[in-house]
Amino acid sequence: MGTISLAVQLFIVFLLTSYLLNKYSTIRKQNPIVTISTFIGWYFSLIIVFVLPLDVAITFFHKCENDRQRILNTTTSTPAPVVPECELPGGYVPDDVLFNLWRVVYWSAQLLTWLILPLLQSYVTAGNFTILGKIRAAVINNALYYAIYSLCFLAILIYAMFKGVSINIENLKVIVVSASNTWGLFLLVVLLGHGLVELPRSLWHHGNRHYRLRKTYFDIEKLASEKSEAEENVKDIYKKVRVLFNSMKNDSNGQRRKVRTILSKFSDDVIDNLFPSRQVIDNAHLDESGPCSEAKLISLHKKTIYAVQTLNNATAQWKVLVDRALFLENLAFSESNGYNLELSRNTCVPIGVRRFWYTRLQTPFCRILGIVTVFMTFFVLFSECTFFVVSYTLSPAAFVTEYASTRFHYKYTQFVAFGIIVYLITSAYFTIFRLQIYKYYHLDPNGHTDENSILFSAILLCRLTPPICLNFLGMIHMDSHISMAKSFGIETQFTKLMGHLDVIPILAKGINIYLPICIILLCAIHYYRVGAYVLHNIGFDQFVEADEMTNDMINSGRSLVQIERNSIKRSNDRSQRTQNWTNSFGSSNAGNGSTTSKFKRSNKNDEERPMLEDDDEEVEESSTRISMMSPTEHPSSSGFFDDM
């Protein structure tokens, strides 16, 4: 029965991973190897939500059995005392099954994060034209990183030898695992320092529509320059490639075929948007260095891939931000003027339910959820700062887990562990899914994420999987090599797999001191937004309240949204006039001559009506037709918190 329960939980994680991967990427357009590798990385990083609490509950069960057996062996009274039987926790599986599952999860994650995913990342961005050439380029690009990793491992190995550690196969494995997990722990500290603060803050601000609208205006203005720069870059590269292609009409070396491959990276939609007339003005000239070499074509191909990805990301973000601003404006207008918010019917959720959510429930729900996450943040922070104190149980996470096992039943520790690990994972992964690295990494929740970004996210998630488990077990005093607690007696299957982190003394003793200090320091930096103010003062655009530059960008963003609204309105009016003309023309062909003449007079009057008169009437009717001027659906209707 326990195996079936575990299989059901693994299937739930499978469905969740499939949903997230389909939400953030376009599976049909991706390389199948990229999709499969990313899916495995995401799956193994989410599987710990169910497997780790089960491991904790089974460990408490083994502790109960050991205590019961010790009581039976040490008692001398007759008759023997009645010792209650230890009840199996829900979803119990044998230790060897759990141990082998952890082995698959851990080593698969390590193989993906250190070898497969970095090579795939370089492979998809390589400019070579053959598979073998891309593989060679990927190996060369990663050679420097592997050399740095080798030097770090050599330094740790020399340090271990000076400390008297015997160098054998088992200790070498432990040293590699310890170094990898230590790097992952510090990465986890950085992500938690951001996520533990920004997750409650984002939920709180999500309930403030005025703040969200101003922030959206700011983001639109900030993105406008990046989008314009990306468009100009794509234009220049396309002109160069087109000139190069036209100059190779008599090519006999196969170079023209490679240039055609580069041209195929520019989709028809991109060309139509950048060159509406389909006429490329030749402002670029080939270099005077002779015929184009293979290296130049590879470099041009790589630049093309990078430029097109940058433009696609900017265009996708632009559409999402504009749709969000239009929706928030419509929502504010409907509330201030008493009109019902018009929503589309393209979802299975009834319109009345969605309207009630947006107008009545969203704000208080987000505020309450923000308060709950603030409490959980303090809970986690206090646990991080006190988990190494074992003389008294000061860690709230350890106290709650121990209280649930002694006061109620140890099987309830599975639910307590599930709640704590879910918030830890949410805080850390929240940062990964919101992180934006300039023109390199961005996860778009509308399926426009490029292959490089989706692979980089899988690298981060795989690298965080073991450290999150170690950190959680240390918080609840179930990892003696982290919390220095020696009295529990039973270790989890995950700890048995990991080996001893205290083989290298500096890794074992320093982690209890530096990890809490770093988390508190980073949380304070993010709470007071020190980084944002520093970047703002040196010239980078940052959203700072009550700042003149920020207000100017908000006003500029509002103007851009108004331009987009007018463009949508004109497009809708044009489509409506075309539809009316088509319907009238069809009815005139089916009717008599009088109907035809009536249509002509009506059509003539419509065509000859002055444009200013149309504008005046549109202004008068704009307040009652706001739903026709912009999208009538929230831009992320599939998830309420996608635009956090």
Curated annotation (Swiss-Prot):
Record's keyword terms, sorted: Cell membrane, Coiled coil, Glycoprotein, Membrane, Transmembrane, Transmembrane helix
Keyword Glycoprotein found: yes
Primary localization class, coarse: membrane
Compositionally biased residues, Polar residues: 624-644
Transmembrane stretches, start-end: 4-26, 32-52, 104-124, 142-162, 174-194, 368-388, 413-433, 454-474, 503-523
Membrane-protein topology: Multi-pass membrane protein
A Gene Ontology cellular-component term: membrane
Glycosylated position list: 73
Intracellular or extracellular location(s): Cell membrane
Extracellular topological segments: 1-3, 53-103, 163-173, 389-412, 475-502
Signal sequence range: none
Renumbered residue ranges of the record's region Disordered: 567-644
Compositional bias (Low complexity): 582-597
Annotated Basic and acidic residues bias: 567-576, 603-612
InterPro entries named in the record: GPCR-associated_LMBR1, LMBR1-like_membr_prot
A Pfam family the protein falls into: LMBR1
Residue runs in coiled coils: 219-242
Statement: the UniProt record of this protein carries the keyword ATP-binding: no
Residues on Cytoplasmic side: 27-31, 125-141, 195-367, 434-453, 524-644
PANTHER family, sorted: G-PROTEIN COUPLED RECEPTOR-ASSOCIATED PROTEIN LMBRD2
Stated role: May associate with G-protein coupled receptors and regulate downstream signaling pathways.
Family: Belongs to the LIMR family.
Protein name: G-protein coupled receptor-associated protein LMBRD2
Taxonomic lineage: Eukaryota, Metazoa, Ecdysozoa, Nematoda, Chromadorea
